[in-house]
């Protein structure tokens, strides 16, 4: 977006002054970032031509598309048609040495690091200043255990670095029960585990991947289900539940195989959809997001259950879930463990001041290590507009209050920009600094909001 500040319009009073008018909206959101990026990796490792339909085109996905091209793969993107074509080479990477730049894309950063670290070659990886601040050591430690040399070009455990990966085992060796074991700590990011899962079956190594922590298991579920859709079924070891968030000290047993090429439909982005469902809740109106259903691969659909506890009603329809906000947006306070849908912690925090009692969010300590220190950012910005907040190690409590005018700092974090835009729909004088940071996942967000 060209403007440096977005002025949010208080539309609450306007909506409820029009007595008798049906208050409803339907919106369409772009494809899921998480699914698009996983599908890109699975496609490049597949046994032939893949077509991804409904793909997201954002900063993150464009970085990953460029990285795949830089590795020598045939890949074409048609943004108008929302379609990406990738020619997989049955797990082979065309080049033996390459430099890739992942920008601020966390999935590209973690997934490509795991893949390249398990494939013979010399790989130079770099990232944006924002991504350079985010941790990589838990994943790099696993690669080092498997014999990959890591040469840091800056701070240890962070981008940039060079991976020197040794040749994978021969087919004969891979067939033996000389299984290797690595343990990955997912306290800061479940992407470390997802990355190893996707890459391991094409690595020439039989791996047992042990897991420390339970953060982000909804995203692990997504990864496993998508691997299954592409023809590889990870074997769960004792301690890993089928239910998101129930994983213990278990893991996954991975053998060798090849992903199947296919035409793959990308789901709408439920993370993006949640802003519009929260808007319907906040304004006390009816909202539908096309193509969003409760059987989604995406864990953020659980956010709608939290909105139900705050007084909303939801209904499945063939076109998508419809949410009815409570009369005049009279939300109830709630205590919510959001470990399975932590990307929506900012969304809930942004509408929490309008609840009739405190809103307590738990299970989100890991969001301190994302695009920004999101826990600190939430507290800082709510305090800036006059809302009382109490923080703790794994969450925070937000107390009811009417927000004052103020400019919301976004910290180059797309979710801060989109989430806090909701606060201004029932308050005067709320501005969003740097709305253009939404390019990371949803460049047209403020146009759709308008």
Residue ranges and their predicted role:
Residues 1-450:
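Structural preference for solvent-exposed beta-strand-turn elements
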């Amino acid at each position: 977006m060209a403007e440096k500040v977005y002025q949010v319009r208080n539309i609450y009073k306007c909506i409820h002054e029009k007595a008798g008018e049906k208050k409803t909206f339907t919106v369409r959101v772009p494809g899921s970032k998480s699914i698009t990026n996983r599908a890109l990796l699975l496609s490049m490792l597949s046994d032939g031509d893949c077509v991804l339909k409904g793909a997201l085109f954002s900063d993150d996905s464009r970085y990953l598309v460029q990285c795949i091209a830089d590795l020598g793969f045939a890949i074409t993107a048609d943004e108008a048609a929302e379609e990406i074509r990738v020619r997989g080479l049955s797990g082979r990477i065309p080049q033996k040495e390459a430099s890739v730049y992942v920008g601020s894309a966390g999935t590209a950063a973690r997934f490509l690091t795991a893949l390249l670290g398990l494939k013979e070659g010399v790989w130079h990886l770099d990232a944006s200043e924002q991504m350079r601040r985010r941790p990589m050591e838990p994943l790099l430690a696993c690669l080092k255990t498997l014999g990959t040399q890591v040469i840091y070009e800056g701070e240890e455990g962070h981008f940039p670095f060079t991976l020197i990966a040794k040749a994978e085992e021969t087919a004969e060796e891979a067939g033996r029960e000389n299984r290797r074991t690595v343990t990955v700590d997912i306290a800061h990011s479940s992407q470390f585990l997802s990355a190893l899962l996707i890459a391991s079956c094409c690595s020439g190594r039989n791996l047992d991947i042990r897991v420390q922590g339970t953060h982000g298991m909804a995203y692990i579920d997504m990864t496993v289900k998508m691997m299954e859709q592409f023809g590889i079924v990870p074997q769960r070891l004792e301690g890993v539940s089928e239910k998101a968030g129930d994983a213990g000290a278990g893991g996954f047993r991975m053998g060798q195989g090849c992903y199947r090429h296919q035409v793959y439909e990308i789901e709408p982005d439920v993370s993006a959809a949640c802003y519009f469902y929260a808007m319907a809740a906040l304004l006390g109106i009816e909202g539908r997001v096309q193509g969003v259903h409760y059987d989604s691969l995406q864990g953020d659909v659980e956010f709608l259950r939290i909105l139900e506890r705050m007084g909303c009603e939801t209904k499945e329809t063939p076109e998508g879930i419809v949410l009815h906000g409570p009369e005049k947006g009279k939300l109830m306070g709630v205590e919510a463990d959001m470990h399975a849908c932590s990307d929506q912690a900012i969304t809930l925090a942004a509408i929490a001041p309008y609840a009739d009692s405190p809103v307590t969010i738990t299970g989100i300590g890991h969001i301190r290590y994302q695009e920004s220190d999101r826990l600190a950012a939430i507290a800082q910005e709510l305090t800036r507009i006059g809302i009382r907040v109490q923080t703790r190690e794994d969450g925070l409590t937000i107390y009811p209050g009417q927000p004052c005018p103020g400019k919301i700092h976004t910290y180059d974090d797309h979710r801060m920009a989109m989430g806090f835009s909701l606060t201004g729909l029932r308050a005067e004088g709320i501005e969003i600094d740097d709305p253009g940071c939404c390019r990371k996942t949803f460049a047209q967000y403020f146009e759709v909001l308008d």
